[in-house]
Amino acid sequence: MQVTQEKRPGSRVGLKIVVEADRVKRSYEKTLRQLEQNIQIPGFRKGKAPRNLVVRQVGRERILASAVDDLINEAIQQAFKEAQLTPISRFELDDEVGQLLAQFNPEADFSFSGYVEVYPEARVGQYKGLTVTATRVDVKPEQIDQLIDRWRDQRATLLPVEDRPAQLGDVVVIDFAARDAEGNPLDEMTTQDFQLELKEDNFIPGFVAGIVGMQLDETKEIAATFPDDYFRKELAGKTVTFIVCLREIKAKELPELDDAFVQEISSFQTVAELREHLQKRLEQDALRQSEENLETAILNAILETTEVDLPETLIEQETTQLLAQSLQALRQEGIKPGELRKFLSELPPETLNQLKERHRPEAIDRLRRTLALSAIVRQEQIAVGSTELDVEVEEVMAAYAQQGQKLDRERVRQAVYESLLTNKVMAWLKSQTTVNWVDSEGNPTQAPTSLAGSEEKVEVPEAEFEADEPEAEVSGIPEAVESSSETATGAETDGEAAAAEAEPATEKAVEASPAETVSASAAEATLPVEEKAAETATEIPAAEKPKPSKKDKKGK
């Protein structure tokens, strides 16, 4: 057998394969014998009918198709081994099957060509002796108050309002319908008893502003414009008229910030203790964010001189994974897996494709980073020791075992290995880089103090490694993994989100869960498995709701 290789765009390898006549004949004879042994012809025992009757019964075209299919499959597997190829896609023929059948002759050589996509290798330019600028993150005094106020807001009591119009900060219940610029109704945007918190950045731009000032039971037309990047392209940038009826207005009454409140939301006894703890956590988060900023700056500099030809198969896989991660927000809102699968299954194909297309640029960026780091690892012969890996795996397994969670050890081992390897290559790159630190205003500043004992460890998303849990798949989108913590709503400043996750207002536990103590490398989309929060892929975004600890009051 003769095999000729050629490089094709998109990390494809073209193969032209010529199979010698004697092998073609043997393959054809093998196909015939298999048919003879399995076909039942009246008047003959199975396997005993004359060949000419078998050919007549089965049909020459079917026999040829079976013979050609077997021959091609055997030939390409051998070609992969000889060429030392590890395909990541199916072999695609250059010619139509009918064309190959027409040229097939059991007594002659048989040739065909096609291609497969293979895992690409990045061509990295300069990665030693870099000079980069990184932003140092510092804790601002108001961040502690913002976190505490957010928890107070989550536990607010909702009080009915009847004597004034709606204002920012209220929670309202509305009915609404919608029509487009031509006056056509948009039935999918019609709903009743929709609860919405009146925040300037909530819902579709212009919608909240239109509700502010409305009186109870008032009906009003509100023009709102969808963002230009809205996932439904037919609505992106378009102005829609909503007919809104205001059913209820509720004002939020926040709990007093005292020791009793602190004891309710945490294991601390006093406000002072909570503030001291938050200060330390925010400082740690600021240091981590500074490190992440440095890693991002280094990776961006490396990518400027990195060339990689990404195959469409990898881009599709990464895009699908990002979309699955974005659906975590739905799980956090309390939507059950079955409901989520139903939601996905009912999405029109074009809508699903639009959702995936939104993640394509990020998918490409993540893949380029991963492949660039992989190339540096090979070039510099950076490795993870088996003892180091075993110790880390045991720590992760033990941490989750304490919570009664059963993990797949091999998958944990792979994730931990990738994380450790990423941490090692990033540490090596930092040692080779000159860093100019600046503050948030861009002014030169000192380097942040290194984290004490800061060994980067893999973050282990629970659903990534749960054993005996089949992965659901609807329209190519794996079931969204369940987030290990709930991010508080509202604007977040540097370090604030992580601190909020570490100290949820709805939990008393102060110590972080395993997913929090086992922190991921800041090199966002590199070698380790990681999660990243993304926008909820809902058509009409769900309103952020306060989380009162008591039922709505009818009055004070």
Curated annotation (Swiss-Prot):
Reactions listed under catalytic activity: [protein]-peptidylproline (omega=180) = [protein]-peptidylproline (omega=0)
Segments for region (Disordered): 438-556
Low complexity: compositionally biased ranges: 486-503, 511-526
GO cellular component, one term: cytoplasm
Record comment regarding domains: Consists of 3 domains; the N-terminus binds the ribosome, the middle domain has PPIase activity, while the C-terminus has intrinsic chaperone activity on its own.
General function of this protein: Involved in protein export. Acts as a chaperone by maintaining the newly synthesized protein in an open conformation. Functions as a peptidyl-prolyl cis-trans isomerase.
Name of this chain's protein: Trigger factor
Biological classification of the source: Bacteria, Bacillati, Cyanobacteriota, Cyanophyceae, Synechococcales
